[in-house]
Each structure stands twice: as C-alpha cells, then as structure tokens.
Design a protein with these regions (language model features):
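Glycine-rich phosphate-binding loop of actin/hexokinase-like ATP-binding domains
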Residues: 124-183, 270-275, 279, 284
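Active-site nucleophile and cofactor-binding loops and adjacent substrate-binding regions
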Residues: 31, 74-75, 94-101, 120-122, ...
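Gly/Ser/Thr-rich active-site cleft segment
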Residues: 56-63, 69-70, 74-77, 148-150, ...
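ATP-dependent carbohydrate kinase catalytic cores
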Residues: 93-124, 217-224, 228
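Short glycine-aspartate micro-motif
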Residues: 2-6, 54-58, 94, 129-133, ...
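Short beta-strand-loop/turn "lid" adjacent to the catalytic site in phosphate-handling enzymes
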Residues: 50-95, 100, 104-113, 131, ...
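ATP-binding/phosphotransfer module of carbohydrate and carboxylate kinases, centering on a glycine-rich
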Residues: 1-49, 169-309
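A glycine- and small-aliphatic-rich helix-loop capping segment at beta-alpha/alpha-beta transitions
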Residues: 19-22, 75-78, 109-117, 145-151, ...
C-alpha cells in the first residue's frame, strides 16, 4: 500500500491506495498536535494499523523544497526527505510542493467538477495553465506541456496601484504591525480574511473564522466589505500571474476559501476585475477562469504521482 498525504500548515490529510486509482481511510490531523512530519505520518499509520503494510508514500507539503530539506513557512516543522524515507518509506518516497501535488489532478478532472467563472471568450486550450489556492498561505503551481512547476508566487508584494481606499487603510495597519509591506499571501489567505475583518470592524478580539466571515456577508456589513475587498484583490492577483505565465490554457482555483468566496453572484464582477487592463484586455478575455469544486484535489493528484512508485 502507498500512503498519500497533503500536509498544509494547519491540517495534514492522509489516505492510502492499493491500486493507484482509488483511495481509502481518509483522515485529517491537526499539524499543531505533532512535532514533526514523521510523527504525523506515524500517528495516522498506527490509527489504521497500517505501519507494517505501507512502505511507500507520496507527500505534498506547504513549503518550498530545497534539495533534501523541507521547512514549512507557516508552521514550525521541518524535515529531511532522505531521513523520512529511511525511517518510514524505504521502498519509495515522492515529496512535492502541495500545489504541485494538486496540479497533477487537473488533467483528470471531469466537467462536472469544474465551474467556469463568468463568460470568457475562450475555452481551456493546450497552453500553459496555473492553479491557485488560498488557504493558510497562498499557493500557485504552473502546468506547462504537462510539466508541473512549483512556485512561491504568493510571496510577491502587492503593487501600490492596487492599494487604494479601504485596502490602503488595511495595508497601513499591516505595515504598522508587521514593519514590512504586505505580500499577496498576507491578504489572500485565511489569516488575511480575519485581518481584513478586524481592521474594518475595529474588533481585535473577534473569534470569527475566515469561513464565518465570508459566509456572514448578508448579516454583517464588515463581513460584506471584507468579502468584496478579497474578491477584488484575488481577481487582480490572478490578472498579474496569468499574464506572467501566459496561461491561455486556463486559471484554475481550488480550496475551501475560494469555494466560499467566489459564488455565482460575484462571477461577473470577478471576471471584469480580472480583465481590467489597458493593454492586455483581449488576451485576458480569452483566458478561462475555472473553479475546482471538489474537496479532494490533493488526494487525486497524489494518486497520479503514486503510479510512478
């Protein structure tokens, strides 16, 4: 059997596969409850009495991979790939960036698992694609000629052109607290949603989660404004990265935040913001924006990679 894992900064999701086409025993563990990736994997394997049955693994991590070392950006854990292989997965181990893991699932998705955002003049082609997913952080992976490219594009600074009106108030507050300019990941993430709400509501002690804030837009004016600003900023971010990648094959969005944030009522304004360019509007109009509606894209990508073990 092969262990499949999608390890973020907040949650680690596990399952196993016997045939590389289906998975079972899915489980989510909180990263904060363990001191290492080895402990997380071992805890899952023991829970399902799989320790002696699993000797291979495919693991996606919310971290850059620099040679043998993996250090998470938004969680206090790190590990050696070779060390993890020697300890638990001696017959084979693949470790990739978590968005790269998810990107391996894109080619196999059914139309029923996708929702097109607004009306574009194009349909997905064989051109470059990108997959973007806001979560604890902000991930982006490229897909070029079926090759997956991991990036850390969430750490780009936000251009001053985009920081105006209420966004300037929020940016100034962030700079005051953090003593640095905000990156897209600072704002287009769960922590960003909560920060927006705290600044707008002037309620530093709020216990609302990012999901509750985005879902309460009809009941709370500050929730509504938070959603409006995040929608705008995400669409403008996608405009920049789509132009950099020349992603005529489509911009794919995945994860619980975007599926809560981008509802049909904002499809058209989201598309209009994405297409807002004085020089490249025709190209942007031809790029499909596609929402991935499934919640197991990490496992689906891991299944594809498991075929290589």
């Amino acid at each position: 059997m092969i262990l499949l894992a999608d390890i973020g900064a907040t949650n680690a999701r596990f399952c196993v596969t016997s045939d590389c086409y289906n998975y079972e025993h899915s489980e989510s563990l909180e990263v904060i409850d363990s001191s290492s990736v080895e402990e997380l994997c071992d805890k899952y394997l023991k829970r399902y009495e799989l320790t002696n049955r699993v000797s291979k693994a495919v693991i996606g991590v919310a971290a850059p991979i620099i040679k043998d070392e993996v250090s998470f950006v938004n969680a206090n854990i790190s590990f050696s790939i070779e060390g993890l292989k020697n300890q638990l997965f001696q017959e084979g181990l693949i470790v990739v960036n978590d968005l790269a893991l998810q990107a391996h699932a894109i080619k196999g998705l059914e139309k029923s698992e996708l929702s097109f955002i607004g009306i574009s003049k194009g349909q997905p082609e064989e051109g470059p694609k990108i997959l973007v997913s806001p979560g604890t952080g902000l991930g982006l992976a490229g897909i070029v000629d079926q090759q997956i490219v991991a990036t850390e594009a969430g750490h780009l600074n936000i251009p001053q052109k985009e920081i105006k009106n209420d966004l300037k108030k929020i940016s100034d507050s962030f700079i005051s607290k953090s003593k640095r300019a905000p990156t897209y990941e600072d704002f287009l993430s769960g922590k960003g949603v909560r920060f927006f709400y705290k600044v707008l509501s002037e309620d530093e002690g709020t216990n609302l989660s990012s999901k509750e804030i985005l879902e309460n837009k009809d009941l709370n004016e500050d929730c509504s404004k938070t959603k409006e600003l995040i929608v705008y900023l995400l669409a403008s971010y996608l405009r920049y990265v789509a132009l950099v990648w020349g992603s005529t094959g489509g911009v794919y969005l995945a994860g619980s935040i975007v599926n809560t944030l981008i509802t049909e009522e904002v499809y058209q304004t989201f598309r209009e913001t994405f297409e807002s360019s004085e020089t490249m509007q025709d190209l942007l109009k031809a790029i499909p924006l596609i929402l991935v509606t499934i919640d197991d894209i990490g496992f689906r990508g891991a299944l594809e990679l498991s075929k290589k073990l």
